[in-house]
């Protein structure tokens, strides 16, 4: 499953970066990071990652919770969405 985490830092960016590095180096089992991006606007960063289930994805958000507030979205590809539309 594909997930997108929208992140707001709770602490200074430098502290969040150091803590985030630690999290990304010690990921929960089965999680694969596809990309991490710092952003301008409402959110400070975005993580795109794969996890075997929502339960495993939640673990990453819990681990990050000390220094980051996350809003996690489940994502599917455009192609998958179009296939689903065809089944309606």
Task: Please give the residue ranges for each predicted region.
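General N-terminal targeting signals
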Residues: 20-24, 48-50, 62, 66, ...
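Short beta-strand element of the conserved SAM-dependent methyltransferase core
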Residues: 5-7, 49, 72
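A generic structural signal for short beta-strands and their flanking turns/coil linkers
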Residues: 29, 41-45, 66-68
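Short, intrinsically disordered low-complexity segments
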Residues: 34-60
């Amino acid at each position: 499953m594909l997930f997108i985490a929208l992140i707001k830092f709770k602490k200074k960016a430098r502290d969040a970066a150091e803590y985030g590095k630690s999290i990304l180096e010690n990921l929960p089992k089965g999680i694969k990071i596809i990309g991490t991006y710092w952003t301008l606007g409402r959110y400070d960063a975005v993580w795109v990652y794969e996890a075997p289930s929502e339960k495993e994805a939640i673990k990453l958000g819990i681990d990050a919770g000390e220094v980051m507030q996350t809003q996690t979205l489940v994502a599917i590809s455009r192609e998958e969405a179009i296939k689903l539309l065809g089944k309606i």
